[in-house]
């Protein structure tokens, strides 16, 4: 029987072999991919998106949380935002008036994620309690203004890092977790429909931090993980991942489908955002900033979102910056962190309204901010 030392040696050798093969595969793919988005766009005479510092302004600051803001989501149809904070509350905001319509005290204060149902009548949240709680906003509130939990989805063996409703389906929700899995739930019954990963060899090998459902093909979703990979899943086939995407060198904190559903973007601890082709698996572009003057390490990318056309990529960073990238030319056209009334802490979350008229950012400074183009122009 092999000793522990021998097993460790074999494991180290196998790991080195896998890493070597992965690097050879990356180099081979790079040889076959004769260009990237940025170089091709320049050959076609594309010019950068033009921005002035006064074009995008902070028109609202939403104050009400007493702890770090961790997550936010826009309702699909109306001008409402839900936010989750370290203070153990969910707050539902009217984005037009800055008024709070609900301030829900959670039974577990360690919340990490929140999401609106497609009809805007319910919100979901999850965190370190390993559960996903559903609240019906039409429920009768108690004397303190709190509303009861309508459903608790239990089954994960680790923290719930992200949740998202399947588009146009109020009864279907997908969660990602520190137990290395994603789960499709029936919200009505509270039952798990499918588990993605776990004992299956094609699943993630570390905590799953983020997910994004394809709005064009709602059967498909991607998940980003601490194993530095993204996996594509088909909710009809839970037994295996459709494809695995490599390229990052750190935890993947955020994934988001491109508006056309044919590509997706990522944001990582390695300080870069990347754009991948869903079908081919090719990495199309890397969006990387220069290191800070006093620090050789790049700030972490915490959250990303695309404009409705896909021409702009919004990326929040751990140092409080929020870059607006031109996705075609891989250039930063604006940094919201340099504008008046910007955040004073880490950007933890961000999201674009469904009509593309406004961007909302959340921060560890306890505030949310709504950004819009001056002159009421939509974000391109």
Swiss-Prot record:
Keywords of this entry: Cell membrane, Membrane, Repeat, Transducer, WD repeat
Write out the GO biological process terms.
defense response to fungus; endoplasmic reticulum unfolded protein response; fruit development; G protein-coupled receptor signaling pathway; jasmonic acid mediated signaling pathway; lateral root development; plant organ morphogenesis; reactive oxygen species metabolic process
| SMART domains to which the protein is assigned, alphabetical | WD40
Show the coiled coil region(s): none
WD repeats, residue ranges: 64-103, 106-145, 155-195, 203-243, 247-286, 296-335, 342-380
Q: Which domain of life is it from?
A: Eukaryota
**CDD domains the record matches:** WD40
UniProt-listed PROSITE patterns:
WD_REPEATS_1, WD_REPEATS_2, WD_REPEATS_REGION
Principal subcellular localization: membrane
Cellular component, GO, one term: heterotrimeric G-protein complex
Pfam families membership: WD40_Gbeta
Q: Which cysteine residues pair off into disulfide bonds?
A: none
Compartments annotated for it: namely:
Cell membrane
Q: Which InterPro entries match?
A: G-protein_beta_WD-40_rep (IPR020472), Gprotein_B (IPR001632), Guanine_nucleotide-bd_bsu (IPR016346), WD40/YVTN_repeat-like_dom_sf (IPR015943), WD40_repeat_CS (IPR019775), WD40_repeat_dom_sf (IPR036322), WD40_rpt (IPR001680)
Q: How does it assemble?
A: G proteins are composed of 3 units, alpha, beta and gamma. Interacts with the gamma subunits RGG1 and RGG2.
The UniProt similarity line reads: Belongs to the WD repeat G protein beta family.
Q: List the PANTHER family.
A: GUANINE NUCLEOTIDE-BINDING PROTEIN BETA G PROTEIN BETA
What does the UniProt function comment say about this protein? Guanine nucleotide-binding proteins (G proteins) are involved as modulators or transducers in various transmembrane signaling systems. The beta and gamma chains are required for the GTPase activity, for replacement of GDP by GTP, and for G protein-effector interaction.
Specify the protein name: Guanine nucleotide-binding protein subunit beta
**Organism from which the protein derives:** Oryza sativa subsp. indica
Q: What is the lineage of its organism?
A: Eukaryota, Viridiplantae, Streptophyta, Embryophyta, Tracheophyta
């Amino acid at each position: 029987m092999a000793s522990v030392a021998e097993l460790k040696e074999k494991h180290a050798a196998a790991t080195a072999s896998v890493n070597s093969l992965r690097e050879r595969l990356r180099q081979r793919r790079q040889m076959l991919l004769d260009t990237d988005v940025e170089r091709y766009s320049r050959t076609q005479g594309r010019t950068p998106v033009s921005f002035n510092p006064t074009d995008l302004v902070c028109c609202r600051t939403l104050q009400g949380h007493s702890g770090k803001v961790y997550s936010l989501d826009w309702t699909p149809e109306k001008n409402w935002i839900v936010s989750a904070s370290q203070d153990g509350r969910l707050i539902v905001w009217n984005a037009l008036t800055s008024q709070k319509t609900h301030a829900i005290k959670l039974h577990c204060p360690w919340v990490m994620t929140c999401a609106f149902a497609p009809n805007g009548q319910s919100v979901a949240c999850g965190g370190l309690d390993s559960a996903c709680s559903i609240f019906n906003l039409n429920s009768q509130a108690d004397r303190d203004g709190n509303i009861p939990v309508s459903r608790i989805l239990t089954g994960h063996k680790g923290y719930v890092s992200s949740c998202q409703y399947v588009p146009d389906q109020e009864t279907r929700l997908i969660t990602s977790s520190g137990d290395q899995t994603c789960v499709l739930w029936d919200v009505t019954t509270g039952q798990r429909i499918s588990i993605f990963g776990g004992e299956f060899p094609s699943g993630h090998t570390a905590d799953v931090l983020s997910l994004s459902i394809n709005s064009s093909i709602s059967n498909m979703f991607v998940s980003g993980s601490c194993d530095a990979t993204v996996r594509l899943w088909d909710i009809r086939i839970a037994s295996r991942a459709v494809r695995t995407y490599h390229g990052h060198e750190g935890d993947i904190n955020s994934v988001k489908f491109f508006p056309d559903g044919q590509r997706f973007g990522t944001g990582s601890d390695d300080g870069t955002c990347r754009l991948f082709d869903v079908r081919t698996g090719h990495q199309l572009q890397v969006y990387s900033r220069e290191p800070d003057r006093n620090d050789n390490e790049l700030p972490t990318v915490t959250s990303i979102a695309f404009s409705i056309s896909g021409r702009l990529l919004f990326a929040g960073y751990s140092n409080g910056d929020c870059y607006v990238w031109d996705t075609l030319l891989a250039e930063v056209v604006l940094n919201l962190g340099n504008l008046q009334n910007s955040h004073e802490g880490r950007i933890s979350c961000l999201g674009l309204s469904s009509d593309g008229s406004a961007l909302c950012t959340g921060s560890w400074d306890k505030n949310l901010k709504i950004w819009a183009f001056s002159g009421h122009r939509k974000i391109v």
